[in-house]
């Protein structure tokens, strides 16, 4: 080490001994070498340019114009390639300061303008950061033809315009906040020059047409976004550029903050409308939720066939829009007819029974029903659900419709869901009302309630406009004194009229929702039904009635699980409405109740559904992190306690893992009462967990509290404290649950956000407490509904064997959501294995059967995807999925009130492509179906699908797939081949020989 340091010092000394005289010649030599390296042609060019600059310095003004023109020609002729700095710009760089001083001396405006034109291009290579000389001299020049300088120069100008505009905005903001209150004049000063907003905008509007003309649609949109003038874009767009411009704008929407996202959608809508692309325009109008815009699209054409095509697009969204001549299509009057045609063409008309998907004969273990203690009535109920989902919409089955005795193989409320499954089999077909009519005259209230619910399901989304049979049949039962009957009728109305904004339903159910004298169950059910009917409308009357319930209900009523559905109803009302929810959130925050924070999270998440807002997701993740930071000692104590607890659990492993599994906590408590040391450890663990701010619940805590109360003298005071703690605990539990669901809702909008959310869910599953872990699987299911990705359902499979049975049940249900309507073979196998694994645990087996039913929804012809190919969010579908997810915050509650699972029926739709001719008759056309490819911003005309298979309509279209016509024999009325598509013969088509 010493030797090395000595050597370094020696070299430093040697270098320091070299005199400056010896160093400078080296630099001069380098310069000489560079000059020598210039070719003869380059040297001549450099000399000529320097001569031209010298002429500009002379007093003879007659030479100025010719010299400037020569300079311009020289620069333009050399800028054919931008792989390196053009040589004239390189050679002129040292003269830039001289040319700037010449500009300041001259007085002739024409010559100054011409010189500013040259200086603007030179400033690209010389100008320092923050000076924006290129833009400054461009604005000082009157030369309008600046396009000849090339694409790179125009892009440089656009960059400086954006920077200057941002400086102006910041300056305006500073002026507004300044204490002297002086107002800004809308300009920004840079090196003594004032950039005015008007001049900058005028130049910007000169640049935009250049970008559009030279395949720079993205640059044009970005520039107008920078200067907040995106509404000025439509005037520059023509039939050659509008498609690429609008595709780029719509793709940008999930990445933009409000109100820019809405401005982009409205601008794209106006462009599509002006170019007569009506099907694209109506998709954006639905996305914006503006009925006036939808009407404008219909009014833009008088073609009745186009009106029908637009009506079919609206029908899939279950909107409340009314238009004369196509009302039966908008009301889904032909949906059942088209679906049965699909079933016939695909040879699916034969009914299936649940055993066809259970495949119990493949299970090597003992028969499910022979297992000790298994409730066969509950498994018959599960079969009713599976049968209803499996044969949904087919109007026939082998289990229930012709077998009146099947209903009585279930018990109590199970009969309600069993009868209601008939409505599921006849969904979208009013013939189901006749099948259910006979059950209305039965004495058992559960059976009658099932018939009422079934009527609502069979009429789901189908509206005649004049006569509403479901409303006529159900309206007399909503005020029935029997809660079972009234709740079923209310729920049936909610399913039947989801998304319809029907005023008659509002008038019927609002008094029930607003009444605080009725049981909270009835009021919550009425509020939920109204929210589904008026999803995403911000209806003031319903909002007021829900808020009244929060304010006027007793503390005991607000402890029930039904409160969650009141909060959910408020969220569904404001779904996708963004900032419009702010007033409601302010009102909620004024309520002094532990539930307040949880309600805010749920309502806020619903309002910003699909926005992909990163800041909101960060806020939710912050809520999910433990609030209190413990010292090292506490952490050490907790680790010790956990270690001891785990060792005891291991010691008692056999008893903990008894088949019932559901009562692990109880068994642990019993064992620890015997073992004094274990009891101390348990108490210690409880204390440290409370310090950490984590919520605790379950049989263990209740038993400990009972011991405390019996030994305590002041039981009354303790009781009050316990109640307050329970309320706070319930509020925290719900807040955590809603925050997890909120991440899924917000991330739905774009693919990158979905990928990131899945990573977050993995972390939450590892580090979250029990309440967070219970909701993570459901959130994963919502993010990938009807999209069975291997990485998602493999993760869910791991969670389905969790020690916490509630985590397992939610994971299994999420697997059903993930594969809803896909018939995915891998998922089907995993669910069959889970059915065998949980053959002795009846609740988990029930959920597994439900998941199997969802997987085989409509024999694989249905979907619950919340987006269509045009990226339009289906609010009715999302609201129906969210209802079951919120119910599963407490799986035991949903198992008791299983009829709420039928809310899913409101969001189910066929995933077919059905081709019709001008007359509305089905025709067979060859289409290519393949994986959708993102073509936004790509050059040329890239293929929109890859790995396609050619099929004849009708065909099924899964998540992430797209279709296109194979030949030009037919012309489509819609740009997206999805759902019902109307085609017309192409008069110019000739068959290839």
From Swiss-Prot:
Q: Where is the composition biased (Acidic residues)?
A: 665-680
Other facts noted in the record for this chain: Present with 306000 molecules/cell in log phase SD medium.
Q: Which residues carry this modification: Phosphothreonine?
A: 24
Positions with biased composition (Low complexity): 179-191
Compositional bias per record (Basic and acidic residues), positions renumbered to this chain: 1-11, 24-34, 681-720
Gene behind this protein: RPN1
Molecular function (Gene Ontology), one example: protein-macromolecule adaptor activity
Specify the protein name: 26S proteasome regulatory subunit RPN1
Region described as Disordered = 1-44, 170-191, 628-728
Its family remark reads: Belongs to the proteasome subunit S2 family.
Q: What is the lineage of its organism?
A: Eukaryota, Fungi, Dikarya, Ascomycota, Saccharomycotina
Annotated Gene Ontology cellular components are: cytoplasm; endoplasmic reticulum; nucleus; proteasome complex; proteasome regulatory particle, base subcomplex; proteasome storage granule
Q: Which UniProt keywords apply?
A: Phosphoprotein, Proteasome, Repeat
Which windows of the sequence hold PC repeats? 417-449, 450-487, 488-522, 523-563, 566-598, 778-809, 810-844
Which residue positions does Phosphoserine occur at?
16, 19, 178, 187, 695
Function field: Acts as a regulatory subunit of the 26S proteasome which is involved in the ATP-dependent degradation of ubiquitinated proteins.
Q: Can the keyword Repeat be found in this entry's annotation?
A: yes
One GO biological-process annotation of the entry reads: proteasome-mediated ubiquitin-dependent protein catabolic process
Keyword flag Nucleotide-binding: no
């Amino acid at each position: 080490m010493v030797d090395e340091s000595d050597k370094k010092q020696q070299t430093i000394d040697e270098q320091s001994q070299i005199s400056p005289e010896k160093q400078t010649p080296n630099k001069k030599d380098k310069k000489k070498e560079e000059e020598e390296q210039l070719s003869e042609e380059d040297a001549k060019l450099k000399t000529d340019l320097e001569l031209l600059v010298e002429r500009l310095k002379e007093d003879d003004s007659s030479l100025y114009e010719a010299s400037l023109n020569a300079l311009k020609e020289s620069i333009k002729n050399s800028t054919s390639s931008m792989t390196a700095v053009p040589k004239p710009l390189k050679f002129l760089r040292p003269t830039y300061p001289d040319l700037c001083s010449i500009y300041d001396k001259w007085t002739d405006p024409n010559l100054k303008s011409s010189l500013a034109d040259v200086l603007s291009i030179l400033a690209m290579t010389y100008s320092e950061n923050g000076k924006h000389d290129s833009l400054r001299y461009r604005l000082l020049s009157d030369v309008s033809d600046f396009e000849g300088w090339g694409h790179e120069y125009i892009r440089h100008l656009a960059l400086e315009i954006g920077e200057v505009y941002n400086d102006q905005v910041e300056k305006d903001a500073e002026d507004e906040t300044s204490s002297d209150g002086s107002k800004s004049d809308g300009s920004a000063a840079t090196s003594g020059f004032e950039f005015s907003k008007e001049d900058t905008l005028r130049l910007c509007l000169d640049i935009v047409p250049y970008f559009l003309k030279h395949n720079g649609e993205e640059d044009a949109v970005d520039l107008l976004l920078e200067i907040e003038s995106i509404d000025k874009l439509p005037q520059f767009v023509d039939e050659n550029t509008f498609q690429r411009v609008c595709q780029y704008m719509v793709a940008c929407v999930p990445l933009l903050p409000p109100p820019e996202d809405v401005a982009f959608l409205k601008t794209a809508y106006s462009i599509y409308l002006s170019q007569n692309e009506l099907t694209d325009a109506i998709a954006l109008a639905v996305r914006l939720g503006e009925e006036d815009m939808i009407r404008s699209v219909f009014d833009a054409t008088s073609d009745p066939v186009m009106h029908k095509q637009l009506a079919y697009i609206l029908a899939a969204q279950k909107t409340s829009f009314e238009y004369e001549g196509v009302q039966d299509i908008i009301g889904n009057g032909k949906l059942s007819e088209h679906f049965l045609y699909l079933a016939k063409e695909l040879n699916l008309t034969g009914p299936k029974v649940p055993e066809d998907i259970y495949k119990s004969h493949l299970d090597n273990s003992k028969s499910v029903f022979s297992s000790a203690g298994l409730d066969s009535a509950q498994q018959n109920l599960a079969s009713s659900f599976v049968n209803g989902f499996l044969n949904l919409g087919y109007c026939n089955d082998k289990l229930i419709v012709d077998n009146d005795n099947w209903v009585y193989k279930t018990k109590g409320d199970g009969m309600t869901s069993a009868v209601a499954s008939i409505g599921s089999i006849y969904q979208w077909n009013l013939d189901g009302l006749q099948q259910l009519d006979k059950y209305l005259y039965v004495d058992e209230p559960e059976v009658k309630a099932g018939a009422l619910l079934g009527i609502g399901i069979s009429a789901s989304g189908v509206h005649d406009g004049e006569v509403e049979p479901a409303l006529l049949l159900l309206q007399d039962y909503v005020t029935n004194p029997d809660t079972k009957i009234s709740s079923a009728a209310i729920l049936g109305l909610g399913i039947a009229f989801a998304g319809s904004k029907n005023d008659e339903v509002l008038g019927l159910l609002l008094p029930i929702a607003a009444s605080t004298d009725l049981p909270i169950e009835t009021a919550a059910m009425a509020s939920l039904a109204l929210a589904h009917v008026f999803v995403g409308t911000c209806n003031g009357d319903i909002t007021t009635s829900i808020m009244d319930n929060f304010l006027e209900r007793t503390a005991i009523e607000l402890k029930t699980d039904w409160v969650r559905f009141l909060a959910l109803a408020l969220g569904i009302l404001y779904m996708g409405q963004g900032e419009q929810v702010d007033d409601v959130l302010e009102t909620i925050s004024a309520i002094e109740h532990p539930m307040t924070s949880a309600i805010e999270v749920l309502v806020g998440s619903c309002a910003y559904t699909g926005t992909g807002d990163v800041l909101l997701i960060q806020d939710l993740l912050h809520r999910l992190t433990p609030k209190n930071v413990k010292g090292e000692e506490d952490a050490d104590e907790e680790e010790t306690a956990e270690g001891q607890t785990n060792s005891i659990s291991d010691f008692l492993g056999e008893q903990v893992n008894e088949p019932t599994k559901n009562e692990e906590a109880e068994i642990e408590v019993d064992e620890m009462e015997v073992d004094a040391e274990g009891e101390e450890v348990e108490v210690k663990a409880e204390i440290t967990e409370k310090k950490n701010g984590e919520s605790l619940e379950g049989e263990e805590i209740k038993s400990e509290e009972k011991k405390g109360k019996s030994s305590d003298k002041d039981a009354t005071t303790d009781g009050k404290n316990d109640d307050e703690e329970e309320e706070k605990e319930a509020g925290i539990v719900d807040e955590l649950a809603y925050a997890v669901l909120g991440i899924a809702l917000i991330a739905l909008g774009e693919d990158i956000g979905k990928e990131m959310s899945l990573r977050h869910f993995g972390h939450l599953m590892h580090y979250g407490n029990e309440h967070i872990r219970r909701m993570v699987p459901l959130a994963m299911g919502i993010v990938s509904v009807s999209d069975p990705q291997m990485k998602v359902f493999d993760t869910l499979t791991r969670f389905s064997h969790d020690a916490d049975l509630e985590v397992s049940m939610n994971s299994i249900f999420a697997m059903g959501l993930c594969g809803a309507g896909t018939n995915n073979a891998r998922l089907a196998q995993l669910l069959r294995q889970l059915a065998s694994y949980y053959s002795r645990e009846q609740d988990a087996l029930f959920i597994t059967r439900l998941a199997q039913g969802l997987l085989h929804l409509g024999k694989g012809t249905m979907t619950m995807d919340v987006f269509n190919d045009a990226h339009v969010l289906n609010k009715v579908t999302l609201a129906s999925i969210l209802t079951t997810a919120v119910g599963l915050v407490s799986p035991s509650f949903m198992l008791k009130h299983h009829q709420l699972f039928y809310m899913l029926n409101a969001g189910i739709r066929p995933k077919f492509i059905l081709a019709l001719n001008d007359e509305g008759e089905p025709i067979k056309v060859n289409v290519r179906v393949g994986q959708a490819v993102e073509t936004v911003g790509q050059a040329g005309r890239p293929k929109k699908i890859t790995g396609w298979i050619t099929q004849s309509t009708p065909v099924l279209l899964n998540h992430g797939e797209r279709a296109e016509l194979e030949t030009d024999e037919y012309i489509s009325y819609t740009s997206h081949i999805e759902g019902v598509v109307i085609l017309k013969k192409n008069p110019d088509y000739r068959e290839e020989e």
